[in-house]
A protein has these predicted regions:
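Short, acidic/small-residue loops that bind anionic groups at enzyme active sites
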Residues: 101-102, 120-143
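Structural motif
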Residues: 9-13, 34-37, 105-107, 316, ...
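Beta-rich, aromatic/charged-enriched effector core domains that present basic-aromatic interfaces
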Residues: 107, 133, 137-180
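Intrinsically disordered, low-complexity Ser/Thr/Pro/Gly-rich regulatory segments
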Residues: 165-416
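A broadly used, surface-exposed interaction patch
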Residues: 29-102
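Short Gly/Thr/Asp-enriched flexible loops that form oxyanion-binding sites at enzyme active sites
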Residues: 108-123, 388-391
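N-terminal beta-strand-loop-alpha-helix module at the start
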Residues: 1-50
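Hydrophobic beta-strand segments of well-ordered beta-sheets in folded domains
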Residues: 3-9, 25-33, 59-63, 100-103, ...
Length: 416
């Protein structure tokens, strides 16, 4: 296909498909039709900036429809037709557009797409991209502008930047530093043990988490005098675990990060700080409390074949005045952003509905997203049957998928 002189796109709130078309087709000129509503959402600015900054697009970008004196509402037939007869007609003449342009009718209101497509003497062909949930291959349907007869397909590249997809919706993207413990060679085996321990009543086979976690969790939730700096957890508090084996196990945990002696062992037991204000202390507590589960899920996704460019962790998506929450895991598969909220367990203060609300809050105004809760089996096991049924019903009503992560095979429901 020869280079396209002029490519028109009707911007909407969901523009990933059109963005990918621009990258693959490389038209000389991209013309963004921007209604007043879309301009108010700032979608045109994000689209233009992302395309210009992609380093893959080399054409020019033009905008029409939102400027003062030539605004397009795009919802009523008479208003659209009047705009087409005046503003659009003048615009095409100024840009020497005559039977040398392509209109992508994927976005916008149906009536706007229909009336634009009906303009004679402008279009070489029409393009349409269906939302292809079940296909790894993304393609564009080509249509004759008058008869609407199919003219073939254009297969798009499977290479696409997840960050670019996010930039179409977020005004700013911040990357939070990952927990450095995940780089330690012992962290993954310990994460596997932590996962296994959720279904264990007593320590066995060198896995002492069933003895350690209740003691740590009790210490972390207890109130202490303001002037107290440290806590001593004596060996007998860890129940049936033998002190010599317990020391070796706790040393492994302590050595996951340089704690500079603030968490240490002595002849009486384990010494912990009361406060975890310092970064390394906070990283250690966070990993033991839940970051281990994120590390495990990330590893399983990679083992299931998810590519680096399809996967992001720890992003904060800022939209307007909303600072947004940090996302656990983000995927891009089959032309769709997938927001994953992970939960290793629920604290006594948490409710089953909390992760549901969190994944909705993270993904608001982010286009046609897929929302997924990846939960450790212990969450379902600990819930009352009626409570769990109600939770499943609420998730289904909000089109949120639940994955009980019993193993890496369970995560294939996310990528198949």
């Amino acid at each position: 296909m020869s280079q396209i002189p002029h490519y028109f796109i009707i911007l909407s709130e969901h523009n990933i498909a059109e963005y990918r078309a621009c990258l693959d087709l490389q038209p000389q000129n991209v013309h963004l039709i921007v209604t007043k509503w879309i301009a108010g959402k700032n979608a045109h600015t994000r689209f233009k900036n992302t395309l210009e900054q992609s380093e893959q697009f080399h054409g020019k970008i033009h905008e029409i429809g939102f400027q003062s004196g030539s605004q397009l509402i795009g919802e009523q037939i008479q208003e659209i037709q009047s705009w087409l007869n005046t503003v659009f007609k003048t615009y095409c003449a100024e840009h020497h557009i005559k039977n040398n342009a392509i209109l992508n009718i994927t976005g916008g209101t149906k009536i706007l797409s229909l009336l634009l497509a009906a303009q004679t003497g402008i279009w070489q062909e029409l393009h349409y991209q269906a939302f292809q949930r079940s296909s790894d291959q993304i393609f564009i349907d080509r249509l004759h502008p008058q008869s609407l007869q199919p003219q073939g397909e254009i297969i798009l590249s499977n290479q696409f930047s997840l960050r670019d997809g996010l930039k179409l919706y977020a005004d700013e993207i911040k990357k939070h530093s990952p927990n450095p413990i995940i780089e330690h060679p012992d962290s993954l085996p310990l994460a596997q043990m932590r996962f296994t321990a959720q279904n264990m009543q007593q320590p066995e086979n060198g896995n002492l988490f069933p003895a350690v976690m209740p003691v740590l969790e009790k210490a972390w939730t207890k109130e202490y005098p303001k002037d107290q700096k440290e806590i001593l957890l004596e060996w007998q508090e860890f129940g049936p675990a033998q002190p010599d084996k317990l020391k070796l196990f706790l040393e492994k945990l302590i050595n996951l990060i340089d704690l500079q002696g603030q968490i240490r062992l002595d002849e009486k037991g384990l010494i912990l700080p009361v406060k975890y204000n310092k970064k390394t202390l906070n990283y250690w507590r966070k990993w033991i409390s839940g970051d281990w589960f994120e590390q495990l899920i990330y590893t399983w996704l990679k083992e299931n074949g998810v590519k680096d460019e399809e996967l992001e962790t720890g992003l904060q998506l800022i939209q307007g005045e909303s600072q947004g929450n940090e996302t656990d895991i983000l995927l891009f598969r089959k032309n769709q952003l997938i927001f994953c909220e992970l939960k290793s367990d629920l604290s006594s203060q948490s409710k089953l509905a909390d992760p549901l609300r969190q994944v909705i809050d993270q993904s608001l105004n982010m286009g046609k997203v897929r929302r997924v809760l990846i939960l450790s089996p212990v969450i379902k096991d600990n819930a009352k049957p009626q409570q769990w049924t109600e939770f499943e019903r609420n998730c289904a009503a909000k089109n949120i998928q639940i994955i009980i992560a019993r193993d890496k095979e369970a995560l294939k429901a996310l990528t198949s």
